Amino acid sequence: MSCCDLAAAGQLGKAGIMASDCEPALNQAESRNPTLERYLGALREAKNDSEQFAALLLVTKAVKAGDIDAKTRRRIFDAVGFTFPNRLLTTKEAPDGCPDHVLRALGVALLACFCSDPELASHPQVLNKIPILSTFLTARGDPDDAARRSMIDDTYQCLTAVAGTPRGPRHLIAGGTVSALCQAYLGHGYGFDQALALLVGLLAAAETQCWKEAEPDLLAVLRGLSEDFQRAEDASKFELCQLLPLFLPPTTVPPECHRDLQAGLARILGSKLSSWQRNPALKLAARLAHACGSDWIPVGSSGSKFLALLVNLACVEVRLALEETGTEVKEDVVTACYALMELGIQECTRCEQSLLKEPQKVQLVSIMKEAIGAVIHYLLQVGPEKQKEPFVFASVRILGAWLAEETSSLRKEVCQLLPFLVRYAKTLYEEAEEASDISQQVANLAISPTTPGPSWPGDALRLLLPGWCHLTVEDGPREILIKEGAPSLLCKYFLQQWELTSPGHDTSVLPDSVEIGLQTCCHIFLNLVVTAPGLIKRDACFTSLMNTLMTSLPSLVQQQGRLLLAANVATLGLLMARLLSTSPALQGTPASRGFFAAAILFLSQSHVARATPGSDQAVLALSPDYEGIWADLQELWFLGMQAFTGCVPLLPWLAPAALRSRWPQELLQLLGSVSPNSVKPEMVAAYQGVLVELARANRLCREAMRLQAGEETASHYRMAALEQCLSEP
């Protein structure tokens, strides 16, 4: 058979390809075409390759392009099977005068015909051809060769059909298709636009797996698209705005892409545009904000103006969408604007290396305040039936970000919304699995309807904790939160989150957000201890909380790198113990003794004696573990010392326990070994407070302090109260 006959037989694949677009059903008369039936019979009875070629050519002539339906294609497959196209794809012996790629082209054409049947597209015999098909996309050859072009078209037809099956994307990724598509696109050869379209589909279906298998190649495509975006002067820049979010990696965007992406966005957003042109640009900017923060925006005047423009546009879009009652909200666009507003909040509150100058910050805060007012207005309209909608979650998120930094403005509106926020947080807390699903849906909204973005926190309460921490200091908001049951909800939430830190969980992979959430809960409880002590005494949830603090602190203080959380737990527990001192759980039980021993460990290990060059006397210095975080720790430490001092007269067993720990003796020994000039007055006051109460509470403590030169040390440090106490019998 001649090479021309082979090419003609290949037109069967073309019939199948065109049929995949048209799919007209054969009527009963056509389905019984006697000529076609005879040729199919010949195809089934063919005894060698030459006879199969001839029969295929006859079938091609009997079936007009576009007149083949799924049933007929299946009958052709039943007659041909996979063995023949398999040989065509792998053979290295072509007829004289016929390029070997013509045989492969015919094999691919047959596969393309078969793959238009979804059942055949997922057949193992098709799936195991993925690596071979992928190599065809990047094979070198004459770009004007019709057979080669036909083979490339058929290859994309096969791969696209496989991608449309349920498990197809996974097989394509495993077969090296993503890298091949990237190389085909970057080569800009024939069919490169089809490569990009298929890449988009695979990234939409399995982003994480694509990046895991082909990160270098995908980054190369991103660099190419970014350069095209920066150079584009025509409508293609808007198309690239739609594509680029799909090609941003799940971790971080390469710095070499930052300039091109920012320049392209600046040119688009700085022009007068319709919404369909502007909205994709806002979404792309939001995705970049998620991935890079503000790192992708250049430092200097142009960068600050661009950031101000972004936040301005986002705030205007939010107000237009949420202030007009009855208008349809473009939730994906508004959610993207929320991300840009959050970027604005971060930059406005950044003290060092902020992109914004002070006048710009003042202006943006005013603009964002109006947009947050629109968000509050929207949330006040939300009924119970909408509380599980992702857009509501996104709206609560941006409000939480605002309240974390600013609670003095919009105070009346915030107080009006607080009952809703407590109910909303409680609803999602009680349905944690659905809340996690909502979180992912919100991430999808921020980017596009098809592409998942960075995960957002899975519970609304964590978003609101920083704002509630500020609000519990103020009388009005605190009363509303207490009335709506927020303290009880916070206790339950704290206990649930604490379970994640228990020995049964791998705390080495504990998300930072969990520990930060626990610390913020502690701060809220500290506010309530100080401002609403009666609540702590009467609400049973705080008794449960106290029990958890007592049983947890002993192991927590031993864990490396968790000193700040231990400080929060210790200080909160000490302050609550002072209020709950009559509770049976605090009457010298093993749990209470373990807690106070751990609290003493935290308080006693903060400072050490450190030798100084050229001096015979050491100085009081922070211990290495405390030194790096003392700025965050010192307020808790001083508060903890004060709370421990207050517990000593209320718990008779505590002074003997402290004596057995040797804390008072070691404290006096430390003070005696350092220069008094190196001990700050506030440290002297804190140490004296503890030593005086221990001495007053227990005779054995007084005797032990005297033996440790307590009176002499008290005199050196001008601790009059301690000196007087130790001088008494």
Swiss-Prot record:
Disulfide bonds: none annotated. GO terms for cellular component: cytosol; dendrite; endosome membrane; glutamatergic synapse; neuron projection; neuronal cell body; perikaryon; postsynapse. The modification N-acetylserine is found at S2. Expressed in the neuronal, chondral and bone tissues. Expressed in dendrites. Enriched in the brain in the surface layer I-IV. In brains, protein level increases in male but decreases in female with advancing age (at protein level). In adult brains, it is highly expressed in the forebrain and hindbrain. Highly expressed in the hippocampus, piriform cortex, septum, amygdaloid complex, medial geniculate nucleus, inferior colliculus, cerebellar nuclei and the nuclei of the Vth, VIIth, and XIIth cranial nerves. In bone tissues, it is expressed in osteoblasts and osteocytes. It is a lipid-anchor. It is found in: Cytoplasm, Cytosol; Endosome membrane; Cell projection, Dendrite; Postsynapse. Coiled coil: none annotated. Disruption phenotype: Death between 3.5 and 6.5 dpc. Heterozygous mutant do not display gross anatomic abnormalities. They however show abnormalities in developing cartilage. Nervous system-specific gene disruption by conditional knockout results in epileptic seizure. Displays no overt neurite outgrowth phenotype. Shows a behavioral phenotype associated with a rodent model of schizophrenia, as observed in alterations in both sensorimotor gating and psychotomimetic-induced locomotor activity. Pfam families: Neurochondrin (PF05536). Probably involved in signal transduction, in the nervous system, via increasing cell surface localization of GRM5 and positively regulating its signaling. Required for the spatial learning process. Acts as a negative regulator of Ca(2+)-calmodulin-dependent protein kinase 2 (CaMK2) phosphorylation. May play a role in modulating melanin-concentrating hormone-mediated functions via its interaction with MCHR1 that interferes with G protein-coupled signal transduction. May be involved in bone metabolism. May also be involved in neurite outgrowth. This is Neurochondrin. It comes from Mus musculus.
